[in-house]
Amino acid sequence: MKNLSRIFLKIGGILSIITGAIFAIVTIVFIILATPASTDFLLEGLKNGTVHTDMQGTPEQAVVAIQIMFLSMAICFGVAMVFEGLTAYFVLKAAKKETEGAYITAIVFGFLSGTQLPLVGAIFGLIASNKEQRKKPNPAIE
């Protein structure tokens, strides 16, 4: 069960790294679209009809609203990227340390990032460490 836990944690850590990289790319795209450099592109798209919105007002007001939305999306994906990075760090650390505290930390950050594979690996690790503790004699009883 320990080996299965270690495998799930390593695969989950790699998955978190890949997901974090994808979130970083999406964050960069939204930041670029939120800059004033993309104002002309969006304004031209609104006037030509290639960019469709149901917003009331002038196209200039719609561009400002769209850029605010892009900036808020960049912030959301940036936060998700940070959580994925932390998840990758703690999950790979849990695969290496194999302690109950590391497994619990991996469960918490796996839940916060939305990556399910580290959750399974950490739960398997907790079960395996609990079985190992039951096999050891308790010196307090003897």
Model-derived segments and their meaning:
Residues 1-4, 43-46, 131-142:
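Intrinsically disordered terminal tails
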Residues 3-37, 67-96, 100-134:
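Membrane-embedded alpha-helical segments of small multi-pass membrane proteins
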Residues 38-65:
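Perimembrane loop-to-helix junctions flanking transmembrane segments
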Residues 44, 56, 60-61, 84, ...:
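Glutamate identity and glutamate-enriched acidic tracts
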